[in-house]
């Protein structure tokens, strides 16, 4: 199934450049866009993934059809980084997770512009283009922290920037890519050392969280009690294991803590 799934993701990524942006709509929330490419890719993925695992269901960003159950469920973001796509920023990805018993057992992120395939299966490690990857061991004061601004939720903008500034004062620097999936993938392979965003949907973090965990990293919902859940919007905090406590301490100081 792995090879077939990777081919499905690559075909979906071809839509990014092979199709023209003929329609851009505004969804609910500030700067929340959907294009004809988002819809075309999701339609393709739904058909391909349901054929790959008969009896499964698909939860996608554009349709949000179905709810997460114990049954095999694909959680899909057809274009993570739609605003980047609109501006030809070339930092967008296809994100696919397969959940069983409400937990990801497989995660894939395909960045077509860089031809990079991030992949993980629960208990079997993570890879980039077939080579095993691990999170970094960079110390806290030299860490690079990626973040998202939760742009669809303007009420979180000030808190997001305040938190980013706090990390900037504590670590080496901060980065903003515009794609949570890519940020999590880059964390998994050591390109940066931590990531936060104050509001993400399951299709933003389901695949990436598994890839980070299988690469030896830590992923939490710092404002939620208990373990990671994949059926809700939530703040996401992720990092390498060696700086997890320090990253969490800054987050708690500036953005709150578990309920």
Model regions and ranges:
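Residue-level signal for inorganic ion chemistry
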Residues: 16, 38, 49, 82, ...
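Acidic beta-strand-loop-alpha-helix segment within the catalytic core
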Residues: 97-184, 226, 232-259
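Acidic, metal-associated active-site segment
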Residues: 183-189, 206-214
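N-terminal subdomain of lithium-sensitive/metallo-dependent phosphomonoesterases centered on the IMPase/IPPase/PAP
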Residues: 1-79, 256-259
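Acidic, metal-binding active-site segment of PIN/NYN-like and related structure-specific nucleases
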Residues: 57-63, 216-231
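Alpha-to-beta junction loops
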Residues: 189-194, 217-218
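A short, glycine/Asx- and small/polar-enriched loop/turn
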Residues: 68-72, 140, 188-191, 230-233
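Active-site-adjacent structural elements in enzyme catalytic cores
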Residues: 51, 59, 68-134, 210-213
